[in-house]
């Protein structure tokens, strides 16, 4: 039942005996949390957290911080003590020294007329790190060519910072999804890279 201890769409509240921190993913110090509402990596500590990987000290040190904090790889926001999923750390796009969270850009573009679905991925871009690319499925009846990169950027600029705006737009027929309905950004990225290679 809904109540003060539940929020629709939230990950929820930590279990008893479980400590959580939301920290900078590039400098995951449990003593320095990001401000509420800001995205950060979720750290978890408690009796249910495993002690490490069997005979793999390097993987253990990468996953478990001093003090028993587990790096989950989940990018979350905390608001009123509730946690909200933002992205996975491995899907973060690094462009020009800025972190771009694909789900934030996707939400902005998805609200655009003519766009049924969208995935945002990073493509290799030399000195800039990665280029932000949007791959979108158009709504039925949308005229091909009516949803342009310029129109997408203009629409999304009201909701996301300029550095997060896409620099490439691909229109695709169908969005690749997992069996549970999650967008397969890795597959989208491979499709876009294959198209770019064909174009030369």
Give the positions of each predicted feature.
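AMP-binding/adenylate-forming catalytic core of the ANL superfamily
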Residues: 46, 51-52, 67, 73-164, ...
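Sparse recognition of residues in long alpha-helices and their boundaries
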Residues: 35, 168, 172, 196-197
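Conserved AMP-binding/adenylate-forming
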Residues: 1-83, 89-92, 105-106, 115, ...
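Beta-strand->loop->alpha-helix junctions that form or flank phosphate-binding loops
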Residues: 12-14, 121-124, 170
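Acidic/polar alpha-helix N-cap and adjacent early helical turns
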Residues: 190-200
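Generic structural signal for residues in well-ordered beta-strands
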Residues: 20, 118-120, 169
């Amino acid at each position: 039942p809904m109540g003060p201890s539940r929020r629709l769409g939230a990950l929820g509240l930590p279990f008893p005996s479980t400590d959580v921190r939301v920290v900078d993913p590039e400098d995951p110090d449990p003593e320095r949390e990001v401000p509420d509402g800001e995205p950060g990596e979720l750290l978890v500590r408690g009796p249910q957290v495993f002690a490490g990987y069997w005979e793999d000290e390097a993987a253990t040190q990468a996953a478990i911080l001093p003090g028993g904090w587990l790096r989950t790889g989940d990018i979350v926001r905390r608001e009123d003590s509730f946690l909200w999923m933002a992205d996975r750390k491995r899907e973060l796009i690094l462009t020009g020294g800025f972190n771009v969270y694909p789900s934030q850009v996707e939400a902005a573009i998805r609200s655009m007329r003519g766009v049924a679905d969208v995935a945002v991925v990073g493509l290799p871009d030399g000195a800039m790190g990665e280029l932000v690319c949007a791959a979108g499925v158009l709504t039925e009846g949308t005229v091909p060519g009516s949803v342009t990169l310029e129109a997408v950027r203009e629409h999304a600029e009201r909701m996301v910072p300029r550095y997060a705006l896409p620099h490439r737009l691909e229109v695709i027929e169908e969005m690749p999804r997992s069996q549970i309905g999650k967008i397969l950004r890795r597959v989208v990225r491979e499709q876009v890279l294959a198209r770019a290679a064909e174009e030369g």
